[in-house]
Amino acid sequence: MTSAAAIPTVILNDDNTMPVIGLGVGELSDAEAEQSVLAALEAGYRLIDTAAAYGNEAAVGRAIAKSGVPRGELFVTTKLATDDLGFQSSQDALRASLERLGLDYVDLYLIHWPAGSQGTYVDSWGGLMKLKELGLTRSIGVSNFHAQHLDDIIGLSFFTPAVNQIELHPLLNQAELRAVNAEHGIVTEAYSPLGVGSLLSNPAVTAIADAQDRTPAQVLIRWSLQLGNVVISRSSSPERIKSNLDVFDFELTADQMAALDGLDEGTRFRPDPETYTGS
């Protein structure tokens, strides 16, 4: 089993460090989120990813408190909901998130979606810059931002996000956006790495899993890690949570990586950031 000390980290463009693998709690109930976070922290995870829009920040906070893991060992991410976009409202929203989480600061605060007008998410970015200055978040970043969205906030603020969290799996490998992120020194963080489960039975994935004597989920997570991404996966099963962390003692071959790269067809299981207006 992988221990917390054995999980590699990446240095962000603001010199903070971030574990390369974590647990996400999107779409989990309070009870599921609390159980999953407790199981993850016990298994060795230290990156926990939630969001105001998930409605389970308080449950995540309870699990963190119950775990006994020192705050300094954790990397906690939450996200700004679309309803709270704006310079001042983004600041008020993080303070409310911190109260629900029972924390004095988060390690990473993300704009969840580039919804609304350009001015709205650019103003929100200014709010996040202020929150970083105040020490309420150590790092700031974005989620679901495309190249033009990134150009907007960087060009108008002269401050580059540390992280861009995006849907990413072999059916949507995001090669162009990953390259844009890299050009800016932005870490790509992959969510939905299993294609919301649809890839677990894909013949190319299962063939590699058989060859490596690994689970399909481990193969998919390992593929994303070898691309240089930070990866967050979601599960409410303690057994799968443990298994999904056990990905640091094997490597996919160049041919296996190429086979998974070749599955790309632009398939999204989550909303398209170009058209999404929700939270």
From Swiss-Prot:
CDD domains for this protein: AKR_AKR5H1
Record family assignment: Belongs to the aldo/keto reductase family.
Keywords linked to the UniProt accession: NADP, Oxidoreductase
InterPro entries hit by this protein: AKR (IPR020471), Aldo/ket_reductase_CS (IPR018170), NADP_OxRdtase_dom (IPR023210), NADP_OxRdtase_dom_sf (IPR036812)
A GO term, aspect molecular function: aldo-keto reductase (NADPH) activity
The species this protein was found in: Mycolicibacterium vanbaalenii (strain DSM 7251 / JCM 13017 / BCRC 16820 / KCTC 9966 / NRRL B-24157 / PYR-1)
Glycoprotein keyword on record: no
Transmembrane segments: none
Superkingdom: Bacteria
Protein name: Aldo-keto reductase Mvan_2161
Keyword Transit peptide listed: no
EC nos: 1.1.1.-
SUPFAM superfamilies the UniProt entry points to: NAD(P)-linked oxidoreductase
Active-site residues, Swiss-Prot/TrEMBL: Y54 (proton donor)
A Pfam family that the UniProt record links to this protein: Aldo_ket_red
Enzyme class: oxidoreductase
Residues where NADPH binds: L194, V196, I232, R234, S235, R240, S243, N244, R270
